[in-house]
Amino acid sequence: APEDAEAFIAAANAENLEAYQVAVVTKEPRMVMEWNGAVIADLSREFLNTNGAVKHAAVRVAEKERAELAKPRFGSLRDMAASLKCASRRGLAERFDSTVGAGSVLMPFGGKTQRTPAQVMAAVFPVLPGQATDQASVMAWGCDPEQTSVDPYIGAYNAVYTSMAKLVAAGADYKKAYLSFQEFFEKLRNEPERWGKPFSALLGTVDAQLELGAAAIGGKDSMSGTFLDLDVPPTLISFAVAPLKTGDVLSPEFKEAGHPVYLFYGADTESLKAAWEALHTLALNGKVRAAWAVENGLSEAVMNMSFGNRIGFAAENMSVSYTHLRAHET
């Protein structure tokens, strides 16, 4: 409301932000701009609602060789650990200071050896001097460039689920999460098959959002293009963020030998969401010591969880229902 303008500007100044009143809402359906006493723009609301000239593009989604997605990714555990997908990227992480602002909840690598990579970034919300909070945000990303190159729909769809799964493994409630996307594609020109790639990818993100009830706020495209015969590969990165108390943030490294290890999964969306909800409830009740969102197979998960505290893993094939787990929450 107009009477709140001064209070709003004062609140912005307290946050070191500049704020100015730049317009007044009127009953007349016209946008009028003045400069030095002269009217420099006078446009009707009807014209603004057209959003300019109507544009159309032909789209053709090409056939996909999805058999490529079913091929084994790695020939051995050593190959997996040495791959770009599964390597720790520790050298890259150490080029950045994760302690700036003293708000970090999770270090980039956990455990006494600092060898288990964190799957999320967790940091306390900034507050004014003299204030304190235990409220943090957790943020995670999802992207598989190989999947997106083969099938942009599958790659983008899975990117959303991967980013959300990492939040759940950190202790967050997926129902409170929001998304943002960063996408890169080749120059589209007037070629329907090129238009089909971003079309498929965005359709994949929409389907995933509708299934999870999560909204995407904004997006970013900063590296799309084509240079001579070199095209930017189809890429869609999903970023997910959710609020979480600092004391409820989970780190992924195994904490102590003898702890049982469970696999939470779902064959379809509804069963997967039920698994996520069961894990979240257990985490809030202090029953979860460590969690990892499976991204590149179970082997990668247990290897990374083992590195931080040098705790091994022995598998035993036993089925446990979520009902059974809930019965043991107390």
Predicted regions and their residues:
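Glycine/proline-enriched, intrinsically flexible loops and inter-domain linkers
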Residues: 1-328
